[in-house]
Amino acid sequence: MASHVDLLTELQLLEKVPTLERLRAAQKRRAQQLKKWAQYEQDLQHRKRKHERKRSTGGRRKKVSFEASVALLEASLRNDAEEVRYFLKNKVSPDLCNEDGLTALHQCCIDNFEEIVKLLLSHGANVNAKDNELWTPLHAAATCGHINLVKILVQYGADLLAVNSDGNMPYDLCEDEPTLDVIETCMAYQGITQEKINEMRAAPEQQMISDIHCMIAAGQDLDWVDAQGATLLHIAGANGYLRAAELLLDHGVRVDVKDWDGWEPLHAAAFWGQMQMAELLVSHGASLSARTSMDEMPIDLCEEEEFKVLLLELKHKHDVIMKSQLRHKSSLSRRTSSAGSRGKVVRRASLSDRTNLYRKEYEGEAILWQQRSASEDQRNSTYNGDIRETRTDQENKDPNPRLEKPVLLSEFPTKIPHSDMDMPVENGLRAPVSTYQYALCNGDVWKVHEVPDYSMAYGNPGVADATPSWSGYKEQSPQTLLELKRQRAAAKLLSHPFLSTHLGSGVSRTGEGSSEGKAPLIGGRTSPYSSNGTSVYYTVTSGDPPLLKFKAPIEEMEEKVHGCCRIS
């Protein structure tokens, strides 16, 4: 049929033609319209018959439907016990799970739906079902602190030693004290010991080590990858299986293999916080600068600050070693022998071997220090023995030796310093006019009288010596420790060198032409002072000795006590 534009054009032309021609054109257009209408009616009847034929045959209707696992989980999430019971009666498995491995029993243990938990367990649900992270329903109930569900799960045989991917058991995750008491009571009732707990924790790693040994024996490639591109070293690194990783590294597996996301084993260890594993991988050449498909380095995947600090230290040490190797390159570095690089030897050593090596070094150092300390103690003991022998000799020596030949005072050197005496004396000594008091080593006071009681020639054999013999002192053996200390203090007082410097201070010059050969001694010695029966003498003309201050009593002082003066 002609279009509308064609009809308008034809009408303009028909106005100019005769009437007969316009009539013929109108009839022609009417015939075309009738033919078009007949065709439309025919098509309409055909569609009606076709629709009636479909209805008579009973065609299926389209509708929305869901998988049984989705429907069961959705009903459990809504706590719809009737619908769950309907699914279970229609032979729907209670162990159906979603893409995360989560079952209806997991979901009900999280939401504390006790009725549906009992319903699922009564229809044979697996009480130890594990999701993708190896969590069991008991893990979920213990973590949430649902003590009623924990009791039900234990009654149906829940595994108290089930270990998830993080190496945690249900009692490790439980923070609710009553729930934890129930779990520990059940563990004690089942006879679970710490040895069993440690054995169960190490079971996954031990199984992996066994599988690796089987692969080695069969000659299989240890760099085998799974559907996600992960190798055995990826798995060991993510789970922290140190022994399995050391076994793989000892057999030369690559540490730079990437999975489909561009992750190396070091990335996995960093993401899951396996610090020792990261140190092991770095020591075997893993790169701390490796990047994933998302342009992430291992340190970017860490969540713990302590782990980040460790990785930064490892990176710094690695950079220092590389710079030192580049700086100290020599002809020896081009050798192919094993002595070419010590860093390679350390890098290929296992963590346990290096720990044993450090322990041996510490033991050797401790032995060396013990030997050095023993030698120092021996030297000190020898030195102390010599000091004791010297002290014993000094104590046994007579502090007042007798002159074999009588010696007068005039025989001593006459050129001596000027003294502070009130009046000079010739060839002798005199006591000062004033009275002096001297503090001795035991706190007593020694008085020197103004007028001497007697005078005698120094060393005159005709006059009885006022000094008692040292043998008499030795015969008076000490009976107590106090007396022994006092005797030692008295002996050291006599042997102190300070006395010899004051001996001639009170002696005046004598005339060279003196006719007297006498050597009178005026107050040459004081009356004896005795601390424990032993006489001790002091020459009064030795000048004014300094006043020595000592602490009393003598028992509280050390043995190193010095007297105020000495007779030479």
From Swiss-Prot:
Q: Name one GO cellular component term.
A: cell projection
Record's comment on post-translational modification: Phosphorylated by PKA and, after PKA priming, by GSK3B. Phosphorylation by GSK3B reduces its association with PP1C and enhances PP1C activity. Dephosphorylation by its associated PP1C results in enhanced association with PP1C, but reduced PP1C activity.
Superkingdom is Eukaryota
* UniProt induction comment: Inhibited by TGF-beta1. Down-regulated by LPS.
The record, for Gene3D superfamilies, names: Ankyrin repeat-containing domain
Composition bias of kind Low complexity appears in 333-342
Q: Pro-peptide positions?
A: 566-568
The protein's location, in the record's own words, is: Cell membrane; Nucleus; Cell projection
Chief localization class?
membrane
State the Gene Ontology BP annotations: establishment of endothelial barrier; positive regulation of blood vessel endothelial cell proliferation involved in sprouting angiogenesis; regulation of filopodium assembly; regulation of phosphatidylinositol 3-kinase/protein kinase B signal transduction; regulation of sprouting angiogenesis
Sites where Phosphoserine occurs are at: S69, S333, S337, S350, S477
The annotated consequence of S333A reads: Loss of GSK3B-mediated phosphorylation but no effect on PKA-mediated phosphorylation. Loss of GSK3B-mediated phosphorylation but no effect on PKA-mediated phosphorylation
Q: Which UniProt keywords apply?
A: ANK repeat, Cell membrane, Cell projection, Coiled coil, Lipoprotein, Membrane, Methylation, Nucleus, Palmitate, Phosphoprotein, Prenylation, Repeat
Q: Which residues form a coiled coil?
A: 15-55
Post-translational modification Cysteine methyl ester, affected residues: C565
Residue ranges for the region (Disordered) are 327-346, 373-404, 504-525
- Return one GO MF term: enzyme inhibitor activity
Disulfide cysteine pairs (residue numbers): none
**Lipid addition sites, S-farnesyl cysteine:** C565
Q: Keyword Methyltransferase: yes or no? A: no
Lipid-modified residues, S-palmitoyl cysteine kind: C564
Q: Where is the composition biased (Basic and acidic residues)?
A: 386-404
Functional description taken from the UniProt entry? Regulator of protein phosphatase 1 (PP1) that acts as a positive regulator of pulmonary endothelial cell (EC) barrier function. Protects the endothelial barrier from lipopolysaccharide (LPS)-induced vascular leakage. Involved in the regulation of the PI3K/AKT signaling pathway. Involved in the regulation of angiogenesis and endothelial cell proliferation through the control of ECE1 dephosphorylation, trafficking and activity. Involved in the regulation of endothelial cell filopodia extension. May be a downstream target for TGF-beta1 signaling cascade in endothelial cells.
Q: How does it assemble?
A: Interacts with PPP1CA, PPP1CB and MSN. Interacts (via its fourth ankyrin repeat) with the mature dimeric form of RPSA/LAMR1. Interacts with EEF1A1. Interacts with PTEN. Interacts with ECE1.
Q: What is this protein called?
A: Protein phosphatase 1 regulatory inhibitor subunit 16B
From which organism does this entry originate? Bos taurus (Bovine)
Gene name, Swiss-Prot/TrEMBL: PPP1R16B
